[in-house]
C-alpha cells in the first residue's frame, strides 16, 4: 500500500490479474491482465495519469458513484411527503449524486487482505440534499480472471440509494483507441429510451431499434446509424433492463484480440455508456489522450430517476434495512 498525492493506492495481485484501487472515489485505476490474447500485460480500464485528478474532476473514471447513480429529474424528489432538493450538475438535473458525489470523496480503508480491500464512506444527513446519514462500504475481491464488487449501505433516516462503479473498459488496452471494434451483447429485452436531456421517457421493447443488443454487434457499426436515440446520447447512454433476477449475466464485451469481459449482477439493469463525451482532454495512464469512445462503461444499477417514478422498482432505503449489491467482472 502506497500513498501518492494524498490518495492511497491499494494493489491486489493474483495469477494473471492486477487490480489497483484508490481511496479517492474508491476508484479502480488499473486492471492489468496477462493472458493468451496479447503479448505482455494489458491494462483494460481507463485511468488518470495523475492520481490527484480523481478528487478534483475525475470524470467518474473507475469511481464508485452515489449517493444516487444516474439521473434524478429536476434535482428533486419526494419521499414520505417531504420534498428534497439536490445539487444539480447536469443542467437542471442531478447526475451521479450531485456536484460533490461519492466519486470525489476520500474513502477510508476499512480492511485489506491478500485478495481484497474494503473501503468505507460516511455521507452525512443532507449531503447534496439527500436525507439521512448513509454508511457505505464497497469491497473489491479478486480471483483467477475475476473481480467481484460488493456494496452495502445503511441509513438512519429514509433515503434513496443507487450505487455503481463507473469503470470504462477497453479490452484492447487503455489508450489504444476507440471501442468501435469491440463486439457487445446485452441481455435485455427492454430499455429506457431517453429524451434530449438523457432522462428516461419510459420503458420500451428493444426490438427493431439500434438498442437491440441481444445478439452481438460491433459497436462502431451500430453507432454509425442515424437514429434519434443515438444522436441524443452521442452513442449509447441507456439503461437496459437485464432479463431475469438474482445473479445473472448482464452484458458480454469482446475486443479485437478475442479478450472477453462478462458482467454479472444482481441489479435490475445496466447503464451502457459508450463514452461519447471524451474529447481528448483527459490524459490516461499511458500518457495518451482519450478521444470519443475511448472506453465503454457497463454500470450495473437500479433504475434512473426511480425516486420520481412510482411505477419502477423502489430504491428507497429505510433505517434497519441494508442495501446490498453485487457485480462480478469475468475476464476470459
Feature locations, PLM:
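An exposed, glycine/acidic-rich loop-and-rim segment of catalytic or binding clefts
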Residues: 1-332
